[in-house]
C-alpha cells in the first residue's frame, strides 16, 4: 500500500486560518459539552430521584451504552459520507444536531426517555472526528502532527471551561439551565463553521476519482491498519471507562454536598492536563516518530490512572487526575497520526470513521464493564481496571510497529513525485 499511497496536491485553503477557525469551533463545542455531560449521575438523583448509588451506576452505564451504540454505528457512516460529499458538511451536521438535542435531555420525564434522546443525539452529533478530518484534509502533510496536537487542546481547554461553567450554573441555577446553555454554545460553534471554515472538496472530481480507483478490502484494511484499530479499541475502553464515574468518585471521597462543584474542579484539572499534553504532543510528533512516544505515554497513563483510585481527599484526586489526563490525552493524537502515515488521503474520512467507530466500540464494552465493576467493587475499581487496560496496550504495540514499517506512506509533493526521489 505504502508506495502507491501518495499525497494529493497541497490544498489551496489557508491552513493556518482554517486551524484557528476549527480550533475555536471545537473549543466552543467542548465548552457546551462540558456544561452538562459530567453531571448526568447527579441529574439522575436530583431530577429523576434515583438515589441508590449502585442503581445509579447501572443507569449511568445504560445511558452511556445508548450513546456509544449509536455513535459507533454513525461514526463509520459519516466518515464514508465525508469522503463522498465533503468534510465541512459533516461538521455542520454534527454541530447543529448537538445544538438541537442536548437541551432536550434536561426535559426528559424519566430515565428511558433520557436514554432515547441521547441515542438519537449521538447518532447525528459528534464533532471531533469530522473536525479532525477537515483539518487534516486542508493541512500540509508535514504539519499533521502539529495540527492534531493543537486541535486536541481545543477539546481540553473547552472542557476545562465547560466543566467550571457547568458546575457554577448547576450550583447557582440548576441542571436545566446548564443543558440549555450547552445547546446555545453548540449553535455558536455551528455558525462559526458555517461562515468561516473552508473546505476545497470537489464532489464531481472526487466522484471521477472514485470511479477510476476501486479498492479491495484487503488493500484498505492492511495488517498495520488492523493492529492500529486494536489499539484504538483498547484505548476506547480504558479512556471511556472512567469518564461517566468522575462525579461518583468525587461523591465517594467528599460526600454528596458540594459534589457538583468539586466535580467541575476535578474535571477542569483533567482538561488542563489534556491542554498541556496537546501542545507537547503536537510539537513532538513533528520531530519524532509517533510510535516512539506511545510507550512512555502508556506507562505514565497507567500509573497515574491507578493512583486516582487510591485518592483519599479531593486535593489528591485533583493532582492525580491532572497527571493522568496529561499522559492519556496524548494517546489518541499519536494513534491518529500513526494512522495518517499508512493510509490513502482520499480515503482518510473513511479511516478516521473506522477509528472513531472502533474507539466508540470500546465505549460500548465499558458500558457493560463499568456497571459490573461498580456493582462488584465500587467506583474505585473502575479506575484500577482502566489502568490495567492501558498496561495491556503495551504488548500490542510490537506487531503494530512491525507492520507499520512495511506499510509507511512516503510523503509526496504537489505533483505526486516522491520527495525522497526529488531530494
Please place each PLM-identified region on the residue numbering.
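Juxtamembrane intracellular "pre-TM" segments in multi-pass secondary transporters
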Residues: 2-16, 199-228, 416-423
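Hydrophobic core of transmembrane alpha-helices in multi-pass small-molecule transporters
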Residues: 27, 101, 112-126, 316-330
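Short amphipathic helix-loop junctions that connect adjacent transmembrane helices
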Residues: 39-57, 245-261
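Residue-level signature of mid-helix packing/kink "hotspots" within the transmembrane helices
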Residues: 67-76, 126, 159-160, 271-279, ...
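Conserved MFS/SLC helix-loop-helix module at the cytosolic interface between two early adjacent transmembrane helices
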Residues: 72-105, 109, 285-291
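Structural signature of the two symmetry-related core transmembrane helices
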Residues: 89-104, 183, 292-307, 387
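Cytoplasmic helix-loop-helix junction between adjacent transmembrane helices
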Residues: 117-156, 338
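A membrane-interface helix-boundary motif in multi-pass transporters
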Residues: 171-184, 372-390
Amino acid at each position: 500500500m505504502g508506495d502507491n499511497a501518495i499525497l494529493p496536491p497541497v490544498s489551496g485553503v489557508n491552513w493556518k486560518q482554517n486551524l484557528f477557525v476549527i480550533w475555536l469551533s471545537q473549543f466552543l463545542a467542548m465548552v457546551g459539552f462540558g456544561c452538562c455531560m459530567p453531571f448526568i449521575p447527579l441529574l439522575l438523583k436530583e431530577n429523576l430521584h434515583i438515589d441508590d448509588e449502585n442503581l445509579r451506576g447501572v443507569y449511568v452505564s445504560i445511558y452511556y451504552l445508548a450513546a456509544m451504540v449509536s455513535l459507533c454505528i454513525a461514526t463509520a457512516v459519516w466518515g464514508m459520507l465525508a469522503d463522498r460529499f465533503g468534510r465541512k458538511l459533516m461538521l455542520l451536521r454534527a454541530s447543529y444536531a448537538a445544538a438541537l438535542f442536548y437541551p432536550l435531555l434536561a426535559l426528559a420525564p424519566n430515565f428511558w426517555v433520557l436514554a432515547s434522546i441521547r441515542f438519537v443525539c449521538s447518532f447525528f452529533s459528534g464533532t471531533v472526528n469530522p473536525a479532525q478530518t477537515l483539518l487534516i484534509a486542508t493541512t500540509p502533510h508535514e504539519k499533521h502532527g502539529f495540527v492534531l496536537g493543537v486541535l486536541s487542546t481545543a477539546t481540553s481547554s473547552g472542557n476545562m471551561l465547560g466543566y467550571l461553567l457547568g458546575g457554577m450554573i448547576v450550583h447557582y441555577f440548576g441542571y436545566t439551565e446548564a443543558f440549555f446553555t450547552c445547546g446555545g454554545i453548540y449553535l455558536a460553534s455551528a455558525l462559526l463553521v458555517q461562515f468561516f471554515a473552508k473546505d476545497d472538496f470537489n464532489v464531481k472530481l472526487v466522484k471521477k476519482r472514485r470511479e477510476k480507483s476501486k479498492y479491495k478490502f484487503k488493500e484498505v484494511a492492511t495488517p498495520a491498519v488492523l493492529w492500529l484499530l486494536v489499539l484504538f479499541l483498547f484505548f476506547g475502553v480504558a479512556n471511556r471507562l472512567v469518564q461517566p464515574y468522575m462525579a461518583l468518585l468525587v461523591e465517594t471521597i467528599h460526600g454528596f454536598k458540594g459534589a457538583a462543584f468539586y466535580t467541575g474542579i476535578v474535571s477542569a484539572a483533567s482538561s488542563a492536563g489534556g491542554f498541556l499534553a496537546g501542545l507537547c504532543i503536537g510539537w513532538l510528533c513533528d520531530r519524532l516518530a509517533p510510535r516512539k512516544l506511545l510507550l512512555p505515554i502508556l506507562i505514565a497513563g497507567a500509573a497515574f490512572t491507578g493512583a486516582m483510585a487510591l485518592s483519599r481527599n479531593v486535593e489528591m484526586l485533583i493532582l492525580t487526575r491532572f497527571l493522568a489526563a496529561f499522559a492519556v490525552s496524548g494517546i489518541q493524537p499519536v494513534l491518529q497520526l500513526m494512522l495518517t502515515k499508512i493510509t490513502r488521503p482520499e480515503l482518510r474520512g473513511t479511516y478516521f470513521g473506522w477509528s472513531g467507530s472502533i474507539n466508540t466500540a470500546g465505549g460500548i464494552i465499558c458500558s457493560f464493564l463499568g456497571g459490573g465493576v461498580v456493582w462488584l467493587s465500587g467506583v474505585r475499581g473502575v479506575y484500577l481496571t482502566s489502568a490495567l487496560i492501558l498496561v495491556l496496550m503495551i504488548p500490542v504495540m510490537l506487531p503494530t510497529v512491525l507492520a507499520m514499517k512495511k506499510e509507511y506512506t512516503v510523503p509526496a509533493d504537489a505533483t505526486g513525485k516522491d520527495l525522497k526521489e526529488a531530494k
